[in-house]
Amino acid sequence: MPNTAFPLVSVVTLTWNTTEVTCDFLRSINEHCQYPNLEIIVVDNGSAVDPTAVFKEIRSDVQVLLNGINLGFTGGNNVGIKAAKGRYLFIVNNDTEFTPGLLEGLVEVFEQHPDAGMVSPKFHYYFHKGTIEYAGYHPVNPFTGRNSMVGCKEKDSGQYETLSTTHYAHGGGMMVPRKVIDEVGALPEEFFIYYEELDWSEQIKRKGYRIYYQPKSLIYHKESMTTGKESPFKAFYHTRNRILFMKRNMSSLQKAIFFTYFTLFTIPKNTLKFIIKKQFLHLKSFWKGILWHFNREIKFNT
């Protein structure tokens, strides 16, 4: 890519009481990123201690925005999105590490494919290098309201090396043009956390854009290969947002399928599971996630 073809990229990441993780993230940019036209925005989501000075010791040009309170993944990142000046915004988790050519490969997709509305790189597990986490997303199952990542936990033997469209971007690293954000809107704050990237992808596709997976760009993610630890917090937001996503994005037939399955299978199964495990706070949060939808006016994506 010639030097004149390096449009400004805004890297936006979120931190909340994870100063050292974010420091490692910034160090990885210093070590591996050669992209010459870059701004870095770290949004602090109400950490107990202001991390600004620590971050600036590592990267003097970093912009640190202090929210004061935890606005969630969506609200926090939207603060950074609003402040960003780049033609392209790379919204990325702070528990990731860059590799050489990451940004160049993502920008290339937009420069060569005018229909691109969002693109994610290939994800490898940081603690299991050579093992794929993400090489695209499968569609959401209309019965369960869940989906899975293409290639997840497979050894990377070059089987996903073709640039391709995919159903959804990876919320841990997604590049979006400013013009698309201006047209579609920022991250949907109704979700707070979980399912937000799926909903945003649906909004972008409805405007006629496509979601791309770029295998030339690789990022390492400090995500466990095993299922994440359950918590009442996750039980609430996963339940609430799964229902919210299906309400906002699925056809009448798909919603009928989902709610029939959810009522007859998901509710009894999860209720019994939490009772057997004596996870009564999880059980309460699961039901709170369901009951949240009663007497709520849902904004549908059109």
Each PLM stretch: what is its role?
Residues S28, D44-A53, I69:
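A conserved acidic beta->alpha catalytic loop
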Residues L89:
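Short aromatic/hydrophobic "clamp" motif used to bind/position activated sugar donors
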Residues N37-G46, Q63-N67:
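Short beta-strand/loop segment that forms part of the nucleotide-sugar
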